Curated annotation (Swiss-Prot):
InterPro entries: Enterovir_OMP (IPR000758), OMP-like (IPR051692), OMP/PagP_b-brl (IPR011250), OMP_b-brl (IPR027385)
GO terms under cellular component: cell outer membrane; host outer membrane
Superkingdom of the organism of origin: Bacteria
Signal peptide (UniProt feature, chain positions): 1-23
Keyword terms of this UniProt record: Cell outer membrane, Membrane, Signal, Transmembrane, Transmembrane beta strand
Pfam family, one: OMP_b-brl
Alphabetical list of PANTHER family matching this protein: BLL7405 PROTEIN
Protein name: 25 kDa outer-membrane immunogenic protein
Residue ranges the record marks as coiled coil: none
Family note: Belongs to the Omp25/RopB family.
Length: 213
C-alpha cells in the first residue's frame, strides 16, 4: 500500500514536466509560415495612346503611257488609337496621318505622293511585355501626276493591311515596328488633253514610339 502511494505521488510530481515537454515538442513540430510573395501587377494594353512614326516606302506606280514607275522615299507622321482587352486578346481602332516624300520621273512623266492617312481595325495577342498584332482598314493619299505640260493632283482612297509588334518600354512608353501594304486602285488623270491611267501600290516599313494614357 505504501509503495502504491509513493508511485502516485511521484507520478503527480512529474506530470507538469511531461506536459511542458509535450507542448514544447508540439510547438517545434509546427511548419514555419511561408513569407508572403509579392505578385507584379499585370500590364494592360487597354486605353488610349498616341505617338509618332518614321518609315520608308517602296512604291510601284503603273501608268498607261510610260509603264511602271517606282517612287520610293521616306515618310513620317503621327498615330492615335484606343485598345480594349479581353484576357490576352487586344483589339481596337487606330488612325494615322502623315506625309510621304515619294517622287520619281520616267520618260517625262512624274508621279508624286504627298499626304497619306488611314483608319484601321487592330487585333493583337498579349505576350507581356510585347504584343504582335494584325491591322487592316481604309487608306487615302494625295497623288499628283505631271507630264511637263500639265499636272493634276487627286485624293485617292484605297485599302491597307499589315502586321506589327508593339513593346512596353515603360508603364506609359510604347515602341513598335510595323509593315504595311496599301493599294490605291486605278484613277484617270487628264494631262493637257492626254488621259493617263494610274494605279499605285505601296509597301512600307515603319518604326514608332508612343505614349499610353
Amino acid at each position: 500500500m505504501r509503495t502504491l502511494k509513493s508511485l502516485v505521488i511521484v507520478s503527480a510530481a512529474l506530470l507538469p514536466f511531461s506536459a511542458t515537454a509535450f507542448a514544447a515538442d508540439a510547438i517545434q513540430e509546427q511548419p514555419p509560415v511561408p513569407a508572403p510573395v509579392e505578385v507584379a501587377p499585370q500590364y494592360s494594353w487597354a486605353g488610349g495612346y498616341t505617338g509618332l512614326y518614321l518609315g520608308y516606302g517602296w512604291n510601284k506606280a503603273k501608268t498607261s503611257t510610260v509603264g511602271s514607275i517606282k517612287p520610293d522615299d521616306w515618310k513620317a507622321g503621327a498615330f492615335a488609337g484606343w485598345n480594349f482587352q479581353q484576357d490576352q486578346i487586344v483589339y481596337g481602332v487606330e488612325g494615322d496621318a502623315g506625309y510621304s516624300w515619294a517622287k520619281k520621273s520616267k520618260d517625262g512623266l512624274e508621279v508624286k505622293q504627298g499626304f497619306e492617312g488611314s483608319l484601321r481595325a487592330r487585333v493583337g495577342y498579349d505576350l507581356n511585355p510585347v504584343m504582335p498584332y494584325l491591322t487592316a482598314g481604309i487608306a487615302g493619299s494625295q497623288i499628283k501626276l505631271n507630264n511637263g505640260l500639265d499636272d493634276e493632283s487627286k485624293f485617292r482612297v484605297g485599302w491597307t493591311a499589315g502586321a506589327g509588334l508593339e513593346a512596353k518600354l515603360t508603364d506609359n512608353i510604347l515602341g513598335r515596328v510595323e509593315y504595311r501594304y496599301t493599294q490605291y486602285g486605278n484613277k484617270n488623270y487628264d494631262l493637257a488633253g492626254t488621259t493617263v491611267r494610274n494605279k499605285l501600290d505601296t509597301q512600307d516599313f515603319r518604326v514608332g514610339i508612343g505614349y499610353k494614357f
